[in-house]
C-alpha cells in the first residue's frame, strides 16, 4: 500500500512524467535485450507500433506501376520514400485493401491441387457425423499418432528429392529418384502443376504435407487413425468426449490397417510351413497391398505391430526395442536382470523349465485396451498399477503381469496338464503355456494370489479376486488407476536378428517377438491384398486351393512336363503342391501318392501311354510321401465344400472337367485355364518304331544340315548324325547306332527322348 502511495506521488510531479516519456533508453543491458538476435522479443507490441505508422509495409518497386497513388477516398496508398536499407517502397495497409478489391485475378485451377490436404479435410468434416457429448473421466494415454491424413509414406530424404525435382527442376544438386512411389508422384505432380503461379515455397510446404508422415506424441482416448486425430480437439477433453464418425477415409490409414492384416496372415501361414523364415520372405516379396509391393510399404511404414515387426525383422530392417508378451508391449524403464534356467513344479506336478529373470526391473505395459506399470523382482511381483477401458481389459492385463512375474503361487495355481500347441502343432514354450492356461480361466490364479489391506491413495483403488473394486482391500500388489500409462515415446529403432522359427531377438539375445505373439484377430482389409504365393492359396478356403493348384500346373505346363519325364522327384517336392495335401484325407494320402507315382512310371516306360490330362489331374496327389501298396484306385477323394468329392482317375468329374474340343479345364465349375498343346500323343509309338537303331541326341542342331524325313534316314552311315523331321513338324538330332544289339531298347527311350527334345 505504501509503495502505491509513493508511486502516485511521483506521477503527480511533471518531471517524473517527462523523464519516463522523453528520456532515451541508453542502458546497455536493455538495448542488448531488445536488439540482439533476429528473434522478435515482443511481437504483439511491435505489430501494434508498426501498424500505427502510416506506411508500415514494404513492397517491390513495381507495385507503384500497378497501384494508383490514391484510392477512391483520396487516401495515399504508397509513399515516395524508399525503405531504408533496401530498394523497396513503403506502402500503406490501404494498398493491400485496394489490391484485394481491384488487383488482377489469377487462375484458381491450381489451388485445389496444391492445397489438396486442406480441401480433403473440409470434405471429411462436411460429411462427418458428430454425435452426443458424454461427460465422463477420460483415460488418455500418450501414443505416437499420425497427425497428417492423406499422405504418402516417403522418408524425409525421399520427399525432399521429389519436392526439389517438382518445384525447382532446374536447380543444381544430385537427386536420385529410385523408388516406384517417388517416380509416380513426381510425374503426377509435374503434370498437375504446369503454369502454376503459387509461390514455390508454398508449393514445397504443401507437397511435404502430402508426402511425409508426421507423427506427434499425443494424449488419446479412442481412435488413433489420422482421421480421428485431426479432430482430437473436438472429440475429447479432460472430462468429456464427443462421438464422431469421419466423413471419409484416407489411404494412409487404409495402408496401415491392410498392412497389419497381410502381415498377420503371412506370419500365421509361415509359422506352419517347413521353413518359416524362407516362406515368410517369399510371401512378403510376392504380396501387393493396394497395388504397391508389400516390401516397399514395410520399408517406409512406421506402424509397430507384432506381425509387421516380424516381417520387418526378416527383411533386416530395424524395429522398436520393446518386446511383446501376451499382446502387451513391454518397455523396461529401469533395473536389469540376468536369465537363468530353473525347473519348477506346477499345481499338477508337471515339471516346467523356466528362463527366470533375476533382478529388480520396472516396465510399462501398453495394450490395445489397457495399460499398466509393473515393478518386479526375481519371481516376485512387487507392484502392478493397471488402467483399462473395462473389466475384461483389466483382467487381461493382470493375468499377463502375473504370469510375467513368474511367481510361485501363479505356477502352483495351474490345474490340469499344460499341453498347448501352436498352429504347426509344436508345443508352446513354458511361459506361453502358462499364459494360455490362465487366459482361459484365471479364477484359481486370482483366488490363490492373496489379498492385502490398502491405503487410500488419490486416483487409485483396490481390486478383489472376483474383480469387484474396493477401497479397503486388494489383490496383493495390484491397484487400479484412473490414469493411463503413456506409450513409450522414444522412437529409437534397433538392429535385431531373426531365427528360422521367426523368433526375433535383440543384440543381447532377449526375445522381443515370436509368432505366438501375433494376434488371432481377423479383420477385413480396406485395400486389396494380392498374395501371389502358393502358400496363401488356402486363405480363401479349400476350393481356392484346388483351383489355384491346377491353374499353376497349366500355367507352367511346359516346364512341369519336362520335369515330369526327367526329374519327377524334384517336381513332387515343389512347394506349390503343399497346400493341396490338406485336402486329401490324411489316412489315405500315402497310398494315393504311391498309386499315382507307379502309374506315372508306367507312362514313362510304356509307349503311347503319355496322357497330358491325366498327368495334370493326378500330379498333386503324387506330392505326398508315398506308401508302397498293391492298392488300385478308380477315383481319388478330396475334401471340399464340407464333404469328400471324387476325382475320377480316368474321365471327367464335377471336380476336374477337361473339355477336349475347347481344351479348357474347369475345376469345381471354375475356369482353370486352357492347354496350349494337343494332349493326343498317339503318333509317338509309330515314330519310335521307325527310329529304332537311332539314338536321339536332343534338339535340332543346324550344323548337321537341313532336316531329313524319316524315310531318308536309312542312308546314314553308323555313327553319323542328322536332323530329322518327326510327328507334328518337330525337328530332333539323331545319330545312327554303331552296334545293333542295343536296338531293342531304343523304341522305349525314343518316346521319352522325342518328348524331351521337342520341349
UniProtKB/Swiss-Prot annotation:
GO cellular component assignments: host cell mitochondrion; host cell nucleus; virion component
A single GO BP: symbiont-mediated suppression of host mRNA transcription via inhibition of RNA polymerase II activity
Gene Ontology MF annotations: RNA binding; RNA-directed RNA polymerase activity
Tree of life domain: Viruses
Compartments where found: Virion; Host nucleus; Host mitochondrion
Pfam families: Flu_PB2_1st (PF20947), Flu_PB2_2nd (PF20948), Flu_PB2_3rd (PF20949), Flu_PB2_4th (PF20950), Flu_PB2_5th (PF00604), Flu_PB2_6th (PF20951), Flu_PB2_7th (PF20952)
Disulfide bond residue pairs: none
Residue ranges of the TM segments: none
Mammalian adaptation (site feature) positions: 627
Assigned protein family: Belongs to the influenza viruses PB2 family.
Function recorded in the entry: Plays an essential role in transcription initiation and cap-stealing mechanism, in which cellular capped pre-mRNAs are used to generate primers for viral transcription. Recognizes and binds the 7-methylguanosine-containing cap of the target pre-RNA which is subsequently cleaved after 10-13 nucleotides by the viral protein PA. Plays a role in the initiation of the viral genome replication and modulates the activity of the ribonucleoprotein (RNP) complex.
Subunit structure: Influenza RNA polymerase is composed of three subunits: PB1, PB2 and PA. Interacts (via N-terminus) with PB1 (via C-terminus). Interacts with nucleoprotein NP (via N-terminus). Interacts (via N-terminus) with host MAVS (via N-terminus); this interaction inhibits host innate immune response.
Protein name in the entry: Polymerase basic protein 2
Amino acid at each position: 500500500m505504501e509503495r502505491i502511495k509513493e508511486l502516485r506521488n511521483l506521477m503527480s510531479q511533471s518531471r517524473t512524467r517527462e523523464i519516463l516519456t522523453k528520456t532515451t533508453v541508453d542502458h546497455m543491458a536493455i538495448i542488448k535485450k531488445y536488439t540482439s538476435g533476429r528473434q522478435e522479443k515482443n511481437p504483439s507490441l511491435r505489430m501494434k507500433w508498426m501498424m500505427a505508422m502510416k506506411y508500415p509495409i514494404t513492397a517491390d518497386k513495381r507495385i507503384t506501376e500497378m497501384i494508383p497513388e490514391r484510392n477512391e477516398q483520396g487516401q495515399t496508398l504508397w509513399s515516395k520514400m524508399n525503405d531504408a536499407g533496401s530498394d523497396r517502397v513503403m506502402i500503406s495497409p490501404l494498398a493491400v485493401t485496394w489490391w484485394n478489391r481491384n488487383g488482377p485475378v489469377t487462375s484458381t485451377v491450381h489451388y485445389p491441387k496444391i492445397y489438396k490436404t486442406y480441401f480433403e479435410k473440409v470434405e471429411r468434416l462436411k460429411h462427418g457425423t458428430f454425435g452426443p457429448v458424454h461427460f465422463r473421466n477420460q483415460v488418455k494415454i500418450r501414443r505416437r499418432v499420425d497427425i497428417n491424413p492423406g499422405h504418402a509414406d516417403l522418408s524425409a530424404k525421399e520427399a525432399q528429392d521429389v519436392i526439389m525435382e517438382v518445384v525447382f527442376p532446374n536447380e543444381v544438386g544430385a537427386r536420385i529418384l529410385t523408388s516406384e512411389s517417388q517416380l509416380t508422384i513426381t510425374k503426377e505432380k509435374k503434370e498437375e502443376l504446369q503454369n502454376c503461379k503459387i509461390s514455390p515455397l508454398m508449393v514445397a510446404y504443401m507437397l511435404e504435407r502430402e508426402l511425409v508422415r508426421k507423427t506427434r506424441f499425443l494424449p488419446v482416448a479412442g481412435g488413433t487413425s489420422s482421421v480421428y486425430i485431426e479432430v482430437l480437439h473436438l472429440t475429447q477433453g479432460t472430462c468429456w468426449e464427443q462421438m464422431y464418425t469421419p466423413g471419409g477415409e484416407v489411404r494412409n490409414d487404409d495402408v496401415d490397417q491392410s498392412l497389419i492384416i497381410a502381415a498377420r496372415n503371412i506370419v500365421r501361414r509361415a509359422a506352419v510351413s517347413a521353413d518359416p523364415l524362407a516362406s515368410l520372405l517369399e510371401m512378403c516379396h510376392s504380396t501387393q497391398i493396394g497395388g504397391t509391393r508389400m516390401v516397399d510399404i514395410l520399408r517406409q511404414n512406421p506402424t509397430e505391430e507384432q506381425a509387421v515387426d516380424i516381417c520387418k525383422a526378416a527383411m533386416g530392417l530395424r524395429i522398436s526395442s520393446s518386446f511383446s508378451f501376451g499382446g502387451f508391449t513391454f518397455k523396461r524403464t529401469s533395473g536389469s536382470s540376468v536369465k537363468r534356467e530353473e525347473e519348477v513344479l506346477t499345481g499338477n506336478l508337471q515339471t516346467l523349465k523356466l528362463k527366470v529373470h533375476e533382478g529388480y526391473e520396472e516396465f510399462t505395459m501398453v495394450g490395445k485396451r489397457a495399460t499398466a506399470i509393473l515393478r518386479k523382482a526375481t519371481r516376485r511381483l512387487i507392484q502392478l498399477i493397471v488402467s483399462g477401458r473395462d473389466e475384461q481389459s483389466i483382467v487381461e492385463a493382470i493375468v499377463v503381469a502375473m504370469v510375467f512375474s513368474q511367481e510361485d503361487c501363479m505356477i502352483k495355481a495351474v490345474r490340469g496338464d499344460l499341453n498347448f500347441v501352436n498352429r504347426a502343432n509344436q508345443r508352446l514354450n513354458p511361459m506361453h503355456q502358462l499364459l494360455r492356461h490362465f487366459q482361459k480361466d484365471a479364477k484359481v490364479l486370482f483366488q490363490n494370489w492373496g489379498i492385502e489391506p490398502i491405503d487410500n491413495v488419490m486416483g487409485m483403488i483396490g481390486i478383489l479376486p472376483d474383480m469387484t473394486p474396493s477401497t479397503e482391500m486388494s489383490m496383493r500388489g495390484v491397484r487400479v488407476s484412473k490414469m493411463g500409462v503413456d506409450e513409450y515415446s522414444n522412437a529409437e529403432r534397433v538392429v535385431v536378428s531373426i531365427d528360422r522359427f521367426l523368433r526375433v531377438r535383440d543384440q543381447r539375445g532377449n526375445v522381443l517377438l515370436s509368432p505366438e505373439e501375433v494376434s488371432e484377430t481377423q479383420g477385413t482389409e480396406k485395400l486389396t491384398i494380392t498374395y501371389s504365393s502358393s502358400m496363401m492359396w488356402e486363405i480363401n478356403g479349400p476350393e481356392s486351393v484346388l483351383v489355384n493348384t491346377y491353374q499353376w500346373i497349366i500355367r507352367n505346363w511346359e516346364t512341369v512336363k519336362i520335369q515330369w519325364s526327367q526329374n519327377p522327384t524334384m517336381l513332387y517336392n515343389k512347394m506349390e503342391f503343399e497346400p493341396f495335401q490338406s485336402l486329401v484325407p490324411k489316412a489315405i494320402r500315402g497310398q494315393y501318392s504311391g498309386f499315382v507315382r507307379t502309374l506315372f512310371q508306367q507312362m514313362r516306360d510304356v509307349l503311347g501311354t503319355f496322357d497330358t490330362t491325366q498327368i495334370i489331374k493326378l500330379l498333386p496327389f503324387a506330392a505326398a510321401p508315398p506308401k508302397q501298396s498293391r492298392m488300385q484306385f478308380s477315383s481319388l477323394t478330396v475334401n471340399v465344400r464340407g464333404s469328400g468329392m471324387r476325382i475320377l482317375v480316368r474321365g471327367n468329374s464335377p471336380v476336374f472337367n477337361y473339355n477336349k474340343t475347347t481344351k479348357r479345364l474347369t475345376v469345381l465349375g471354375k475356369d482353370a485355364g486352357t492347354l496350349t498343346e494337343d494332349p493326343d500323343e498317339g503318333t509317338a509309338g509309330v515314330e519310335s518304331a521307325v527310329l529304332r537303331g537311332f539314338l536321339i541326341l536332343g534338339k535340332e542342331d543346324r550344323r548337321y544340315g537341313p532336316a531329313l524325313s524319316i524315310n531318308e534316314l536309312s542312308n546314314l552311315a553308323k555313327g553319323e548324325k542328322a536332323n530329322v523331321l518327326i510327328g507334328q513338324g518337330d525337328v530332333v538330332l539323331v545319330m545312327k547306332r554303331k552296334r545293333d544289339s542295343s536296338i531293342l531298347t531304343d523304341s522305349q527311350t525314343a518316346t521319352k527322348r522325342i518328348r524331351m527334345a521337342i520341349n
